Amino acid sequence: MLWTDCLTRLRQELSDNVFAMWIRPLVAEEVEGILRLYAPNPYWTRYIQENHLELISILAEQLSEGRVRQVEILVDSRPGSILSSSEQPATTTAALQTAPIPQPAKVKREPEPVANTAVSSKSSKKKLLNPQFTFSLFVEGRSNQMAAETCRKVLTQLGASQHNPLFLYGPTGLGKTHLMQAVGNALLQAKPNARVMYMTSESFVQDFVSSLQKGKVEEFKKNCRSLDLLLVDDIHLLAGKEASLVEFFYTFNALLDESKQIILTSDRYPKELTELDPRLVSRFSWGLSVGVEPPDIETRIEILLKKAENSGVDLPRNCALFIAQQVVANVRELEGALNKVVAISRFKGAPIDLDVVRESLKDVLAIRARTISVENIQRVVSEYFRIPLKELIGPKRTRIYARPRQLAMGLARELTGDSFPEIGMAFGGRDHSTVMHACEKVVSLREEDPIFDEDYKNLLRLLQS
């Protein structure tokens, strides 16, 4: 039979998931040179038309030796057809059950409860965003200021084309989720009846597949496309989820057509998402893309102090400085370190001081001692600027050596627990005031000179990788 031969070839051409979920359940019949394929619902037919009909047509013509010159895909409403019943066909259900279905995302335990979705107060399914994710509780610094300001601006011009979609990108644990949910919380506070939905890309896939299994695709589409604000976390994780990507594409377009706001997050800039459909990636760039960088040491200190204050914890500033010097990767690790310090303090029944902090972070200190040292920083900086190590450490004050030297001292202060005198000794026996001046100079140069700031960020990434 022609369709059986087509199935054999399609199994070779397509992924196992796509074949099992979308192709195997189709019913086929050949009528006067036309191969008719029947699908359970309109969504199914649209997916086949836009993704696989051309391939099926080519195979049908080849395998029939020209007998079949046209392939049609229709919703099966034939009398007595199993596909015309209110239930999904047994073969469809079986196929979906054998295909790997994403499991519900495991929610990390945070000090405050976190929910997956926020919808309007009219909804019968009333779930809330994390109430702690607000603008007032977000600590701003040079690394995230533009992203925070943009998110606040979105609230005043919801759906405006210049920032729709708003695409926040950067490494994990830097506050992208906090910012996007802050927009949702602020909107719901101002307009309690606004329809807001927050989901991860995994939960989008899960809900979509579930709607297919239960025959509730139209309900899923209606829920997603009637929003005022859609927030989707980790959009890059939709890669490889072909059917879900198609549905997200249509949802995305429908919301943009209605000038409804979309905010997405990813670990990379849109054009670096090469594993996603280029059409979708192109649309991600229609609005505004804003990067979020790892926080500098001043911001890390303020994050720790605010977190401690909100938790009713007395954290001395010198202890916050010490923690911030040791934990540099992201906000999540920073908060984890603080939680450990608080736990040790309570266990010992002692106030938080440097001894308690050092004991709490001994594992972190041991790892950092093996990986980031002043000597390591000097080597990386000298290689980056292609200058001899002896000149970086030496006495010459010419600009070609002085700027990299100041930068290296600033990095040493930020990334190691060494004191100013210790850093000075590592740089040819310079005194502590020279190191202090270098660190202050680095702060001012980063604000004044974009090239210097970019060099600093590049070196920070190299040393932290």
UniProtKB/Swiss-Prot annotation:
Gene3D superfamilies per UniProt: 1.10.1750.10, 1.10.8.60, 3.30.300.180, P-loop containing nucleotide triphosphate hydrolases
Gene Ontology MF, one: ATP binding
Location of the protein in the cell: Cytoplasm
Record family assignment: Belongs to the DnaA family.
Low complexity bias (residue ranges): 88-100
Keyword field: ATP-binding, Cytoplasm, DNA replication, DNA-binding, Lipid-binding, Nucleotide-binding
Its biological purpose: Plays an essential role in the initiation and regulation of chromosomal replication. ATP-DnaA binds to the origin of replication (oriC) to initiate formation of the DNA replication initiation complex once per cell cycle. Binds the DnaA box (a 9 base pair repeat at the origin) and separates the double-stranded (ds)DNA. Forms a right-handed helical filament on oriC DNA; dsDNA binds to the exterior of the filament while single-stranded (ss)DNA is stabiized in the filament's interior.
Example of a GO biological process term: regulation of DNA replication
Domain of life, per lineage: Bacteria
InterPro entries cross-referenced by the UniProt entry: AAA+_ATPase (IPR003593), Chromosome_initiator_DnaA (IPR001957), Chromosome_initiator_DnaA-like (IPR020591), Chromosome_initiator_DnaA_CS (IPR018312), DnaA_C (IPR013159), DnaA_dom (IPR013317), DnaA_N_dom (IPR024633), DnaA_N_sf (IPR038454)
Quaternary state and interactors: Oligomerizes as a right-handed, spiral filament on DNA at oriC.
A GO CC term assigned to this protein in UniProt: plasma membrane
Region of interest: Domain III, AAA+ region: 128-345
Protein name: Chromosomal replication initiator protein DnaA
Region Domain II, annotated ranges: 88-127
Domains as described in the record: Domain I is involved in oligomerization and binding regulators, domain II is flexibile and of varying length in different bacteria, domain III forms the AAA+ region, while domain IV binds dsDNA.
Region of interest called Disordered, as start-end residue ranges on this chain: 81-123
Region (Domain IV, binds dsDNA): 346-465
